[in-house]
């Protein structure tokens, strides 16, 4: 068994624990390991942590973290700088009165202006803030119904693997790099993590 550092798009580092990784496919910043590559890890807790660490390549990516701010302003860019122009969370995360998110963000990306879009464009609730948190802290938060929108783990699997706003991260439009892998691969990692016991990396 060995631990390998994996660089995330956000600049953070996590430790991937695995067996026989020399036979695994080469990894780049834009790929995710398949669930089957973790099947040699016999201990459920160790496998769950390894799976969530891999899913963390998506979770800690700026495409995701920027919409999970700890304050009232969304973030932008790979460096996570405050949104320009100045906008605030507002009621329900949809922006202030007279300056709703959909004032500028349409139902789809507007590539000429590099403006991202989705029919339900909005911020995650502040209880779901990820900015400045470790992957382990986010993991515990994702499991906590008081901080995940009241979702069960099965609903989390569905949300991560099928929600179209989550899926925007793989289709972010001009000027933005997508999150690694595919939403199907990401959803499979989250499902396998839950099935292995949903243990979290250390904070």
Language-model-detected regions and their locations in the chain:
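Electrostatic cytochrome c docking/interface patches
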Residues: 37-58, 74, 78-94
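The canonical Cys-X-X-Cys-His
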Residues: 63-71, 98-108
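Residue-identity detector for glutamine
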Residues: 27, 76, 84, 141, ...
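Post-cleavage N-terminal segment of exported redox proteins
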Residues: 2-50, 62-66, 70-75, 192-203
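C-type cytochrome heme-c attachment and multiheme electron-transfer modules
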Residues: 46, 53, 62, 109, ...
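Short C-terminal domain-edge/linker segments immediately following a structured domain
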Residues: 88, 97-98, 133
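Short, solvent-exposed loop/turn and secondary-structure capping segments
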Residues: 68-70, 76-80, 112-117
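Detector for methionine-enriched segments
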Residues: 1, 13-16, 91, 99, ...
């Amino acid at each position: 068994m060995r631990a390998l550092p994996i660089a995330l798009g956000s600049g953070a580092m996590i430790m991937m624990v695995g067996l026989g990784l020399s036979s695994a496919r080469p990894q780049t910043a834009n790929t995710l390991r398949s669930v089957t590559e973790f099947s040699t890890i016999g201990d459920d807790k160790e496998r769950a942590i390894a799976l969530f660490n891999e899913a963390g390549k998506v979770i800690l990516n700026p495409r995701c973290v920027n919409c999970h701010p700890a304050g009232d302003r969304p973030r932008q860019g790979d460096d996570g700088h405050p949104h320009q122009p100045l906008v605030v969370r507002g009621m329900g995360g949809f922006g202030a009165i007279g300056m709703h998110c959909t004032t500028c963000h349409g139902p789809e990306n507007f590539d000429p202006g590099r403006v991202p879009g989705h029919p339900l464009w909005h911020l995650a609730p502040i209880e779901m803030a990820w900015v400045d948190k470790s992957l382990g802290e986010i993991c515990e938060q994702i499991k906590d119904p008081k901080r995940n929108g009241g979702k069960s783990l099965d609903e989390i699997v569905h949300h991560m693997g099928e929600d179209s706003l989550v899926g925007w991260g793989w289709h972010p439009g001009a000027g933005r790099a997508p999150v690694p892998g595919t939403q199907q691969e990401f959803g499979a990692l989250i499902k396998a993590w839950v099935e292995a016991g949903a243990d979290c990396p250390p904070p």
